[in-house]
């Protein structure tokens, strides 16, 4: 599926470039640090995003999932990390 594609890679976002780059850095760092535990990785990302951008952020980290969500405009990112995990983050207060 991702063979031959550059990672990290954004699958979808409506964030502006500054926020997108910052959120991608946060997600990649958490995925690198917690590469063996998706739950701790997701919790770490959520805590950082809540502090940096205000609550309430929601995070999914893993492989083989689908999702359909409501979210605040300009507050959604779906990406593949450098560790091949998919990461979806969105804000919905």
Sequence positions of predicted segments:
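Charged, amphipathic alpha-helical regulatory modules used
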Residues: 1-93
């Amino acid at each position: 599926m991702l063979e031959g594609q550059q990672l990290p890679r954004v699958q979808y976002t409506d964030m502006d470039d500054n926020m997108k780059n910052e959120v991608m850095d946060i997600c990649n760092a958490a995925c690198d640090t917690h590469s063996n535990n998706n739950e701790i990785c997701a919790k770490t990302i959520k805590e950082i995003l809540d502090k940096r951008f205000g609550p309430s952020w929601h995070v999914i980290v893993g492989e083989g999932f689908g999702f359909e969500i409501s979210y605040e405009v300009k507050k959604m990112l779906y990406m593949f990390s450098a560790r091949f995990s998919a990461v979806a983050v969105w804000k919905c207060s």
